[in-house]
Every structure is written in structure tokens, then in C-alpha cells.
């Protein structure tokens, strides 16, 4: 194994000089002697010098320290030994529960499955969240993005999806915490532990306080573990169906921006790295389903300054099957989950995939909400009295629909005090169809707020009239 010596340190970027005939390849991992630090080669500068990013703090590094070339990319433990464990970007345990007992190690830089290996599925994945199941249904083996600005509920929505899908889903889950709060990682661990599904989850964290190299690579570490479960065939020649949760894809882009600037690349639009689309593609193209197994991924995407046209969320949009857009305006009305039904989309929204009843109900709900949106300006200026009877009826139904989209979450029970509700797709379609048909025009709109099924809204209305 060849050895080089450190010649320059600029923050997280370290230059290492090797003998000219032993220069390491791009993406090879280097180990710095006398420290725990791993460096990943990013560029070859010529004259035997390579530019690397440090996966760990560079505190205490100095020039002339020796770095050994491992002659392979960063490799992480994969397989059953990773389940129930919390690991860092290099696959080292950070839960103080001993070494990870893994039978195999895979490199984190891998190719995407070939065209002939990929498969597409139209099977729906029920989430139990009304607004998602009705307006932007998820496909099994699909990619879902939760878009939202700061504090509109991306992580809470993701936790509820984990609660509803991962607990009911008999398969395995991988959670990659990319540049998020350590507290949220801790909450997630205890949530999984309390619900006895920890032995089906592998957790990989590279949190906010870590150097950009860690945050840039931790998503690939989590993805590699998920790929192993998908591709490793059992006795029947089948892989597994895996759930991959990534929180937050924006921090992955941001880490790439930091590294790009340190590597001396010229920034592109809004200061992002010029390789933004390529970096996103490298990650997203690997998150796919093959003929042997599937990866269903749910990714939170932070939207800077609530601007969906920002290059980072805009680049992410192209890779997704379903987009769930969280709106600050809806959150300000106290309607949670704050999903914007007019801005959320799904490729599954096709009568041949979801059925005619579901499709027609979703279209009617969308039309009613769109009409209300158009009438809002008139109402603000002239008031409700100036509207025609038909428009008044549309507004009344739209307000009921808006409130009926709200739902108490299981993971928010500790904050709200009201028990969480899981609503089946059948009940969701039935409820919204009845509202659009005018069956509940006589009920007050408050009765539809924070309930599960339509029967609960009727019950709440009866209680309200009894109190009155």
C-alpha cells in the first residue's frame, strides 16, 4: 500500500503528496496515521498531489503526517448486522453497543442498476394520511419527496409515514439522517425502540454539526445498506422490499456546495456547485426497484425561503414519482398536515392505476378547491353575500374539504393530546365523495377539523349541537 504525506490543509480539504507512480485513484480512501480520520480523494492535481475531503474533523492534523492509500473506496458494513444499530458515514457504530457484526462490506460508490434489471410497479402504498392517499398516492417502489420551508412539518410528516408504513410493513427500513438535528435522530431511535421495530431498521447519521464530507457521503452510506437488502437474494431468488427514508436531501446538496467551494470550483446559479444535477443524479438513479426487490424512498426536501424554483428543490423534482408540497399558508390556518392539495402531484394519478372512483373524487376535490381559490379575492373585497348561491355552496364545501384534510397524527399525540388516526383509502374516498355530493352540507365546517373518518365528523357535529 502506497503512502503519501499531507502538504496542505484548508478546512475540510486536505492535499496529500504521493510518489508519482503510486498516485491513488479518485474516490479511493486514505487513512491518516495516528488518527481516526479517513480522507476521500476528489481530484488529482498533478505532480503526485491529490486533493481530498476529510470525513471527520481535521482538528489536530498537521503537515507531513503520513496517509496510507487503502486502494479501494470507502466500504461500509451491510446485511443483518446493521439492523437496530446507529452508524456514522464510515459504518462505525455510534450507539455504544459494540462493533457491527457484518458478514460483508460494500463500497459506497456503485453504479445504478441497468435498464433491463429495473422494474416499475403500479401497486399503491396506503399511508393512512387522507390528503396524501387521495391527492398524491404513493407507488410501492416509487420515490416520494416532502417539500416544505422551515417549520411547516416535513419531519413530523416523515415520522408519521414511518409510523404508518414501516410498522405495518413487514420488510426492512433504512433511515439516513443527512445534516439534520441530532435531537431528531435521537427521537427517531426512541420512537422505533418503543414500537418494537428497531430490529428491522438500520440508522445512519451525519448530523448538522459534522464536517461537509460526512454530510455529503452519509446518504450514499445509507443507500448502500438499502441496496444490499434489495439485491441480496434469498432461497427463492428474491431480494427484499426496503423502505429508505432520507432527511434531508437539501443538506446533501448544501454539503456538496461547501465541498465544491473548498475544492476551488467556480459556483453556478445562486452559489450552488456546477455539478449539482450530476450529484443529485448519482444518488437518485441508484434509488430504484429491480426485478428482485424494491426500494421505496421517502425524502424530505427543505425549500430555502419557500422558493420552489430554487435550483436545489427544482433539481430534485425531476427524479420523483410523487411530490408532497407543504404550504406555510395552510399551516398558518392551523390545518395539519399542511399539504397543499393543488400543488402536490403523483404519477399514479391515472384512472387505470388508482381506479375511476378514486380519480373522479380527487378531480372533484381539486376543482372545488381551485374554484374557492379563485373566489377568495372577491370574498376579501365584497364579502360572501355578493356571491351567487352556487358559488356560496362551492365555498362552503371547499372549506369543509380543507378542514377534513386535517388529521391527528400518532407521532404528535404527545403535543396535541388527541389520539392519532389512521384512515383507510376506502374511507377517505367515501368521505370526500360524500362532501362533494353535498350529503353533509348541513353540518358546520368546524365538525370536519382534526377528525379521522367522516363518521367522526358527524359525531363531532352532533356533540357540538348538543352543547349549543
Curated annotation (Swiss-Prot):
EC annotation from Swiss-Prot or TrEMBL: 7.1.2.2
GO molecular function, one term: ATP binding
Main localization category: membrane
Compartments, record wording: Cell inner membrane
Cysteines engaged in disulfide bonds, as pairs: none
Keywords: ATP synthesis, ATP-binding, Cell inner membrane, Cell membrane, CF(1), Hydrogen ion transport, Ion transport, Membrane, Nucleotide-binding, Translocase, Transport
Catalytic activity: ATP + H2O + 4 H(+)(in) = ADP + phosphate + 5 H(+)(out)
Top EC class for this record: translocase
One Gene Ontology cellular component: proton-transporting ATP synthase complex
Positions of ATP binding: 148-155
CDD domains: ATP-synt_F1_beta_C, ATP-synt_F1_beta_N, F1-ATPase_beta_CD
Membrane topology, record value: Peripheral membrane protein
PROSITE patterns: ATPASE_ALPHA_BETA
Complex formation: F-type ATPases have 2 components, CF(1) - the catalytic core - and CF(0) - the membrane proton channel. CF(1) has five subunits: alpha(3), beta(3), gamma(1), delta(1), epsilon(1). CF(0) has three main subunits: a(1), b(2) and c(9-12). The alpha and beta chains form an alternating ring which encloses part of the gamma chain. CF(1) is attached to CF(0) by a central stalk formed by the gamma and epsilon chains, while a peripheral stalk is formed by the delta and b chains.
Family: Belongs to the ATPase alpha/beta chains family.
PANTHER family registered for this protein in UniProt: ATP SYNTHASE, ATP SYNTHASE SUBUNIT BETA, MITOCHONDRIAL
Protein role: Produces ATP from ADP in the presence of a proton gradient across the membrane. The catalytic sites are hosted primarily by the beta subunits.
Name of the featured protein: ATP synthase subunit beta
Protein's gene: atpD
